[in-house]
């Protein structure tokens, strides 16, 4: 299965973005994590079926109500066997 790495830029810290990503990932059966970065972005890594990852990416680009997503840098790769979906 593929691996999605998304670096999300905008007003994405302090607005519930990581919890939003976790909720959507779990709804879609994805594994991975969401983590705040020191530069103000959020890194989201997810693994699972390609179709679920593409839908997840759509949600990441929208974000929760209080967020303002300006850009999402995306990289695709091979899965690393992550379990669960964690927020750091």
Swiss-Prot record:
Q: Which InterPro entries match?
A: Acylphosphatase, Acylphosphatase-like_dom, Acylphosphatase-like_dom_sf
User: What reaction does this enzyme carry out catalytically?
Assistant: an acyl phosphate + H2O = a carboxylate + phosphate + H(+)
Entry coiled-coil feature ranges: none
List the PROSITE patterns hit by this protein, alphabetically. Answer: ACYLPHOSPHATASE_3
- Taxonomic superkingdom: Bacteria
Q: Which residues form the Acylphosphatase-like domain?
A: 3-88
Reply yes or no: does the keyword Hydrolase apply: yes
| The keyword Hydrolase is assigned to this record | yes
Alphabetized UniProt keyword annotations: Hydrolase
**Residues at the catalytic site:** 18, 36
Its Gene Ontology molecular function terms?
Answer: acylphosphatase activity
Q: What is its EC number?
A: 3.6.1.7
Alphabetized PANTHER family for the sequence: ACYLPHOSPHATASE
**In which family does this protein belong, per the annotation?**
Belongs to the acylphosphatase family.
Q: What is this protein called?
A: Acylphosphatase
Q: Which organism is it from?
A: Thermus thermophilus (strain ATCC 27634 / DSM 579 / HB8)
- Gene name for this UniProt entry: acyP
């Amino acid at each position: 299965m593929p691996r999605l790495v998304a670096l999300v830029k905008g007003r994405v810290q302090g607005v519930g973005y990581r919890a939003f990503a976790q909720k959507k990932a779990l709804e879609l059966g994805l594994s991975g994590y969401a983590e705040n970065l020191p530069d103000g972005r959020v890194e989201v890594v997810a693994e699972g079926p390609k179709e679920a990852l593409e839908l997840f990416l759509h949600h990441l680009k929208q974000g929760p109500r209080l967020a303002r997503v300006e850009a999402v840098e995306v990289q695709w790769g091979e899965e690393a066997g992550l379990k669960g979906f964690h927020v750091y």
